[in-house]
């Protein structure tokens, strides 16, 4: 009995380590979605290093570096600090990764919440 447990333990540890690892979303993702100010077209370029997420968010309003990005398992979050018509706007993203899609909810400066789906560019 002890021998079976000892043999199974390394396999269990490996399975847990792989499942807890951040999903690699490195690359380009696109999204088109409706907002209070019209249809938005985004290209996100992500780079994952461990649980740290960096990259850019490019929209019709310009390109900005994403900040405070994390990927933990299938959960992803980051902040986009956008200059919109001369006003600073903080947009906070929280999402769930599922294969080649990320379902995001973004909080636009506390004034609006918007749902969108970003798809991996292949």
What is the predicted function of each stretch?
Residues 18-22:
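Sec/Tat signal peptide C-region and signal peptidase I cleavage site
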Residues 8-17:
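Bacterial N-terminal signal peptides
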